[in-house]
Amino acid sequence: MRTFVLRARAASTHSQTLLANVGGDAHSEILAHTLMNAIFVAQSHRDDVVVHLVLESTQDYSRTITFVAAEMRDIGGFHEQALLAKVVRALDASAGMGKEQMKAVESGITVRTQSFEKVVKELAEDGHQLYMMDPKGENIRELDFAQKPCFLLTDHIPMPKKSFNSLKRLGTEKISLGPTMLFASQCVVLINNELDLAGF
């Protein structure tokens, strides 16, 4: 199983604000693009992928929307609008939830009022090896992947420096995809390809 966590610091937890920011400063479309490249392949989808989208622009609590590819049904199409509709449905379902609550949205999709820090801590405690993108990290092609790899990505707003120490305590390893700074959705394509080539 391969896991991706996208920390979307600019993405609104209010569904209509999120949609209004597609193509805007918050770049809400990154959520759909990352989902698309993590889950779909030509004429099919990957069953071995879990994606956690952590939306942090909020009036109350962050929202973590989890997509378990193997359990998803009626995805609705390989395009931005269909995938954003899934995110919107999850956000609408989360309205009024208290802190650290969870709700099933539909088959394969859940939403939690949970922070990025809490999500990655739980993943680490569950045996996932955390990997964070860093131009100075170990070249991904020289990496011996752990059995439960989890890749941490961000939107256009970099990871806060204060997060680095907590991630380091969780055993996070820094890896590099090359010298060029890429979008999260592009990173996902390269990571999936490297895992495929490694026979993962």
Curated annotation (Swiss-Prot):
Record NCBIfam families: PRK02135.1
UniProt family annotation: Belongs to the methyltransferase superfamily. TrmY family.
Record keyword DNA repair present: no
Positions bound to S-adenosyl-L-methionine: 133, 187
One GO molecular-function entry: tRNA methyltransferase activity
Protein's recorded name: Putative pseudouridine methyltransferase
Entry keywords, A to Z: Cytoplasm, Methyltransferase, S-adenosyl-L-methionine, Transferase
Entry's Gene Ontology cellular component terms: cytoplasm
Lineage, opening ranks: Bacteria, Pseudomonadati, Pseudomonadota, Gammaproteobacteria, Oceanospirillales
